[in-house]
Amino acid sequence: NNFFLIFVFMKIIFLDIDGVLNVYCEGRDQFGCTFHSNFVDNLRNIIEQTGAKIVISSSWRSDGLKTMQEMWKFRNYPGEVIDITPFSWELMDLGLFEYYDQIDRGHEIELWLKIHPEVSNYVIIDDDNDMLDNQRANFVRTANNNHHGDHVDVLGYGLTKICSEKVIEILKN
């Protein structure tokens, strides 16, 4: 079955937005703030070099998958948004946790990966550090004061060139 073969080796980017692509409001449209053009260009480079697909793990996903896909297309952002991660309430409904404060973003990503065994490799790009220990090798944190190469990186975070190089390295291994 060719359909199955296409997705057996799928690479996924779990993408947060605020603190990754959106560090300040560069402009506005019907979807809200547009994302920083340099960070979008860095994402484009990642997609071109790895062929990875995007799963939105950001709170922006509360607008729904269809809205995220429409925004991506309307703004001509790189790559393909194929899904959003489950919400905390969905993990609660499944009986996986007793209290909301037990759930981190890493748990939401973990559940998505369990439902999608076709993923061969993944990376998590986020400015928050609430990932699971077994996800650390696949995690690139954009809130980091050690990035001095990008002139845009005045605030010390965002999807800088240095971050994007780390992402590419993870996805190519």
Whereabouts are the PLM-identified features?
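Short, Lys/Arg-enriched N-terminal segments with co-localized hydrophobic residues
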Residues: 1-9
